[in-house]
């Protein structure tokens, strides 16, 4: 089965981009890209499912159940279920560019307006990629943070000439990979077929397909990856 590859440039500039939607039949998550202009906000709402958000650029304030949390580029945010939340662009750093990941169960809808009911009061988890260390490994958000369905990995810089899993020519597993390319260009090999991927691409690698990443350019490639929570500890 071929991977799904869709870029933010495939959508009108500045408009929300549903890069991986329920119509694509993902097994795990949907992925959307959005821009919050200075002085603007995200949607203000509350719902039964969790959000994970990664801020690509900009800074502002996450308001969760009335409490304010500063957020900035490189931050991963886990917003637990039933938390009233909105993100303001009040950081003075231009547009906020971000991706938002939801479990497939969210496709049924039923988000309600913010302020319409009490929130659960569960605090969000906010972690910057600069805070990763030997203990956390590449895991930005995972089971230790209360994530119920999927985890977020920050793959770091894949340097020119680097190849993933060189000893086996790649790997495969029973869960979906959902990947967003933050910077650079590389090659994704799926079941022997090569696909060029570049900054702004959202990629879904179907379960069980043998796959490998390569950087055959002269600049680093950066990615964030979303996997089923059951993959935790499997690399």
Residue ranges and their predicted role:
Residues 35-36, 46-62, 155-159, 172-188:
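Short, conserved beta-strand element in jelly-roll/cupin
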Residues 59-61, 68, 84, 178, ...:
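Structural motif
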Residues 66-81, 192-207:
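Short acidic-glycine-tyrosine-enriched beta hairpin
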Residues 1-28, 106-154, 159, 235:
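A short, N-terminal "cap"/entry segment at the start of jelly-roll beta-barrel domains
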Residues 25-27, 81-108, 207-233:
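Ligand-binding loop in jelly-roll beta-barrel domains
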Residues 13-17, 32-47, 154-173, 207:
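Conserved short histidine dyad/triad with adjacent acidic residue
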Residues 20-23, 41-47, 88-90, 142-143, ...:
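Short histidine-centered beta-strand/loop micro-motifs
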């Amino acid at each position: 089965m071929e991977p799904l590859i869709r870029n933010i440039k495939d959508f009108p500039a500045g408009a929300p981009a549903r890069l991986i939607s329920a119509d694509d039949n993902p097994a795990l998550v949907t992925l959307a890209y959005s821009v919050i202009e200075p002085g603007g906000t995200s949607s203000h709402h509350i719902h039964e499912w969790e959000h994970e958000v990664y801020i690509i650029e900009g800074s502002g304030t996450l308001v969760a159940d009335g409490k304010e949390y500063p957020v900035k580029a490189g931050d991963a945010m886990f917003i637990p279920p039933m938390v009233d939340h909105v993100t303001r662009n009040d950081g003075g750093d231009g547009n906020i560019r971000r991706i938002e990941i939801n479990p497939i169960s969210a496709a049924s809808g039923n988000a309600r307006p913010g302020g319409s009911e009490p929130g659960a009061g569960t605090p969000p988890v906010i972690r910057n990629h600069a805070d990763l260390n030997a203990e956390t490994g590449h895991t930005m958000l995972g089971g230790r943070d209360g994530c119920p369905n999927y985890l977020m990995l920050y793959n770091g810089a894949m340097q020119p000439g680097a190849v993933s899993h060189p000893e086996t020519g790649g790997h495969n597993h029973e869960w979906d990979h959902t990947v967003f390319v933050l910077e650079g260009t590389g090659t994704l090999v799926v079941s022997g077929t090569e696909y060029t991927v570049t900054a702004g691409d959202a990629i879904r690698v179907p379960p069980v397909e043998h796959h490998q990443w390569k950087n055959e350019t002269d600049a680093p490639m950066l990615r964030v990856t979303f996997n089923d929570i059951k993959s935790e500890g499997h690399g």
